[in-house]
Amino acid sequence: MSNPNKAKGSAAERAVADYLNVRGLEAERVPAGASLDRGDIWVPDKSFPAVQVKNHARLDLAGWVDDVAIQAKNAGRETGIVIHKRRGKGNPASWYVTCTLDTLITLIEGKNR
């Protein structure tokens, strides 16, 4: 991959998919260029939200949350989350997750099913 930023993003997506698989979720990285953007990580379980993965030095939380809301609709999911790499932390288990409060409550209450 010639673009270092794309390579960085792809590596972060693979790391998240691998971590979710280790945790017992069937997760796969969605190839770039799909006609309908459903997010970066696909988990067949409909109760799981759409997932957007970010590895950027500059945060754009509002923009990312807006984007993942569109991806959630495209994926047929009620909600979406953004997983973003934490500086200095290679293990996705310690990365951040961003979503709206409404999304958080929906996930906690299990209404995403």
Residue spans of the language-model regions?
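Catalytic phosphate/metal-binding cores of nucleic-acid and nucleotide-processing enzymes, i.e., regions
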Residues: 1-113
